[in-house]
Amino acid sequence: MPLAQATAAAVLEAPVEETVPEDPPPTRNYRFFCWLIGVPANAAARPPAGALLGELLGRVDEIIASETLRAGLLPRAPHVIPQLMKTLRDERYSSTDVADRISRDVVLTAEVVRNATSVLARGDDDEEIDLARAVQVIGTQGLRRAIANVVLRPIFDAKGSSLSARAATQIWKDADRKARLAAAIAGEAGLDPFDGYLAGLLHNSGWTAVLRAIDNLEDLAIGPVEIAHREVVPQVIRRRDALFGALVGPWKLGTLMDELAAEVGSVGLDNVQSPLGCALRDADRLAALRALAPAGERSGAKTVPRWSQLARPVQNAYGGLGA
C-alpha cells in the first residue's frame, strides 16, 4: 500500500454513505480565499485584469527566487524556539527548568498560566497556581502549543489597509484551527501531535508572505477583487506554498518540519505524499470547511463530507474549534 494511502487508512474508519456534498477542491479554494481576504465570492466573478495580473505573479516569482527580497516578508524565527523545543523534546525535562526559561518572557508566562488555569477550571482544583505548577498541569503538549502560539503569533500580525492586513485576523484564525486539526490527525497517523500542530500553524505563514509580497507591488494598482478570481487563486496558492517552503525551511525546527517545508515548497500541498504532509493537507481541507460553514453551524456531521469516516479524536478537534 502506498505511503499516502497507509496514512489515510490510519485516520479514516470504514466508509459510510455520503450525506453532505462537497465542492470540488478548486471551488472550495476559491471560496476560502474570498473568505480570507474579505471579498464576497459573487463579487469575484468579474473578468481578471489580464496582463497586469500576469505581471504581478511574475514579480511575486522574482521575490520568491530572491533570498534578499524574501527576507522582508516575515520576521526571523526567534532564537528561543530551537532552545525550548530541544528541552521539551527531552522526556527527562524538569518542569522547574522549563519554568525558569519561560519566566524570562512575560507574555509566554501569561499564556502558560492561562492555559493551566483553563484546565484546572474544568475540575474541582481551586488552589492558586504558580508557573512551575502551570508547567506540570498542561504537560509537554500544552507547553509546546503555548510557546508556539506566543512566539509565532507576531508573524501573522499586520496593521493598516493593505491586503495582508485585512486578511491577518482570518489567517490567524485559520492557522489556529488547522494546527489543532493537524495535531489530531498526526497523532492518529502515529506522528508526534506537536509536529502536526506546528505544521498547521506555520503553513499559514505562506499566506502572510504571499499577500505581503503582493502589497509591495503598489504600482500595479490591482485590488482584492481582481486577485480573488477563479483563474488567479490557484496561482496564488502555489506561490503561498513556495514561500512557506522557502521561508520556514531555514528556521531548522526539526527534521520532519524541514522535510515538510521542502516538500510543500517543491510540489505544493495538494501533491504531498509524506505522512506529515498528508496530515497537513487533510487539516487544511477541514479548516477550510469550518471557515465556510454557515454562520452558527459547528456540527461536523452537517457540514463535513465523510464525517463518520474521521477518527474520533479528529472529530473532537473539529468540534472544539472556535467560532
Model region roles, listed by residue range:
Residues 220-222:
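Catalytic or ion-translocation cores adjacent to nucleophile or general acid/base/metal-coordination motifs
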Residues 1-202, 207-216, 227-323:
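Conserved alpha-helical "signature site"
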